[in-house]
C-alpha cells in the first residue's frame, strides 16, 4: 500500500510540473529563438499579435519587446535598452499629453524632440474576398528625431514608427479624454494619453553618402594599384634591355643613345623585317653606286597606299650622320649586320640607302632619282616607271624613329 501511494503521489507531482507555466523571464534578457530566426513582423502582425494583447493584458508568446518610456532617452541610447534586435529595435512605451487638457502628445526627449512626418497610415486587416470591407486595426505614424529645440532643431537619421490602436473595445491604449479637474487645481489632472503604443526605432543609412564612400574607396584602390604596378613595369623594361644587350631598342635608347640608333633600327623585333640574307654591305654598295645627291626630293605617288612622306615637296631626307663604334658584326635572326674598317666612311651613305628603303615611293618625274633596295638587291632601271611598286611586297614603317638625332 505504501509503495502504491508513493508512486501515485510522484506521478501527480510530475503532472503538476508539466502544466505549470515557466518562470517569468527577467527584464532585458534575450529571448530563446532557434538559430536562423529573425524578428521582422509586418505592421498587421505587430498590431494584432503584440499591441492588442499588451493593451488587453494578455500574456505575449515571447518576451521580445521591452517596456521603455522612449521620451526619457535619446534614440542612440535605446539599442542597449532593447531586448532583441541588431538593425531595428521594438519597444512598448506610454504616451503623455503635452498639455493637461489637450490631445496633442508630448514628443520632447532628453536632448531633442520627435517630429511627425507625413500623414498617418491606416493598418488594415488582410482579406481575400472580393468587395470585402477590410477592418481598420490601427494607425502608423512616422517620426524623425531632431536635436535641439523646435523649430531650429538639427535633423538626424533616427526614425520611429509608432503604432497605436483605434478600437476601444477591451483596450485602454487609444486616446482617452482627460479626467475632469476638481478643486480648481490642474496638478491633479493626469497627463497620460495612451497606456501603450508600440514603437520601432532604427537609424536610416544615407545612400548617397554610402555611394560616394564606395566610389572614393574604389578610386583609392585604383590609384594604389597603378602606383604599385608602375615600378614593376619599369623594372621589367630595364631587365628586358639588359637581357637583349645593345640589340634591345627601347624608345629612351633611340632618343638618348646615337651609337645604338642604327642597330636598333635593324633589330628584327622593332623593324619587323622578314628573315633574309640582307647585309649592310649590300646597302652601302648600292648607295655608292648611285650618282644621286645626298638630299633628294621624293614625290608622293598614288600607286602605293603607303604615303610615308608629306605630299608637299618640303619632305627632305635627313642628312647623313656617322655612328661611332659601329664596326661590329652581329647576326639578328637570319639577317646579318656586318661592317669592316673600310665601311666607316660609307656609313652616311648607308643611312641614305636605308632612308630610300624605308620610303618606297616611285618617281613621277625624270629629274627625281630614287633607289629601292629590296632584301639587298636594287631594282631594275625600268622599276622607275608605273610598275615600280610591283616588286615591293611588305613595306615596313618604323614608328618612333627620330631622323634628326
UniProtKB/Swiss-Prot annotation:
Gene Ontology molecular function, alphabetical: DNA binding
Keywords: DNA-binding, Nucleus, Transcription, Transcription regulation
Tissues expressing the protein: Expressed in flag leaves, green spikes and peduncles.
Nucleus found in the keyword field: yes
Annotated compartments: Nucleus
Gene Ontology CC entries for this record: nucleus
GO biological process: regulation of DNA-templated transcription; system development
Segments of this protein annotated with the region Disordered: 1-38
Observed phenotype of the null mutant: No visible phenotype, but higher chlorophyll content and delayed senescence.
Note: High grain protein content (GPC) is a desirable trait in breadmaking and pasta wheat varieties because of its positive effects on quality and nutritional value while Low GPC is a desirable trait for barley malt and beer production.
The protein's name in its UniProt record: NAC transcription factor NAM-A1
Native species: Triticum turgidum subsp. durum (Durum wheat)
Gene designation: NAM-A1
Amino acid at each position: 500500500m505504501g509503495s502504491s501511494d508513493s508512486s501515485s503521489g510522484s506521478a501527480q507531482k510530475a503532472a503538476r510540473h508539466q502544466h505549470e507555466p515557466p518562470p517569468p523571464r527577467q527584464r532585458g534578457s534575450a529571448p530563446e529563438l532557434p538559430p536562423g530566426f529573425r524578428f521582422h513582423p509586418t505592421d498587421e502582425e505587430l498590431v494584432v499579435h503584440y499591441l492588442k494583447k499588451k493593451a488587453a493584458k494578455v500574456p505575449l508568446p515571447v518576451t521580445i519587446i521591452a517596456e521603455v518610456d522612449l521620451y526619457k532617452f535619446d534614440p542612440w541610447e535605446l539599442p542597449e535598452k532593447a531586448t532583441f534586435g541588431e538593425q531595428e529595435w521594438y519597444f512598448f512605451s506610454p504616451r503623455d499629453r503635452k498639455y493637461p487638457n489637450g490631445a496633442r502628445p508630448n514628443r520632447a526627449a532628453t536632448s531633442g524632440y520627435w517630429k511627425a512626418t507625413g500623414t498617418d497610415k491606416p493598418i488594415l486587416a488582410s482579406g481575400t474576398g472580393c468587395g470585402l470591407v477590410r477592418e481598420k486595426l490601427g494607425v502608423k505614424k512616422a517620426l524623425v528625431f531632431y536635436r535641439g529645440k523646435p523649430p531650429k532643431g538639427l535633423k538626424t537619421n533616427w526614425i520611429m514608427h509608432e503604432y497605436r490602436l483605434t478600437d476601444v473595445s477591451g483596450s485602454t491604449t487609444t486616446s482617452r479624454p482627460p479626467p475632469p479637474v476638481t478643486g480648481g487645481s490642474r496638478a491633479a489632472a493626469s497627463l497620460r494619453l495612451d497606456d501603450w503604443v508600440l514603437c520601432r526605432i532604427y537609424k536610416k543609412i544615407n545612400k548617397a553618402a554610402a555611394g560616394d564612400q564606395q566610389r572614393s574607396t574604389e578610386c583609392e584602390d585604383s590609384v594604389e594599384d597603378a602606383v604599385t604596378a608602375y615600378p614593376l613595369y619599369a623594372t621589367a623594361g630595364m631587365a628586358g634591355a639588359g637581357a637583349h644587350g645593345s640589340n634591345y631598342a627601347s624608345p629612351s635608347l633611340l632618343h638618348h643613345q646615337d651609337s645604338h640608333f642604327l642597330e636598333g633600327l635593324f633589330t628584327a623585333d622593332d623593324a619587323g623585317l622578314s628573315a633574309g640574307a640582307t647585309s649592310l654591305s649590300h646597302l652601302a654598295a648600292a648607295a655608292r653606286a648611285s650618282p644621286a645627291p645626298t638630299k633628294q626630293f621624293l614625290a608622293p605617288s598614288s600607286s602605293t597606299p603607303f604615303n610615308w612622306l608629306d605630299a608637299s615637296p618640303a619632305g627632305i631626307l635627313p642628312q647623313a650622320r656617322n655612328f661611332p663604334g659601329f664596326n661590329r658584326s652581329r647576326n639578328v635572326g637570319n639577317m646579318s649586320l656586318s661592317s669592316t674598317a673600310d665601311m666607316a666612311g660609307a656609313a652616311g651613305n648607308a643611312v641614305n640607302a636605308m632612308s630610300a628603303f624605308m620610303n618606297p615611293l616611285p618617281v613621277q618625274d625624270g629629274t627625281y632619282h630614287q633607289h629601292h633596295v629590296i632584301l639587298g638587291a636594287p631594282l631594275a632601271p625600268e622599276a622607275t616607271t608605273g610598275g615600280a611598286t610591283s616588286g615591293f611586297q611588305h613595306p615596313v614603317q618604323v614608328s618612333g624613329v627620330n631622323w634628326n638625332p
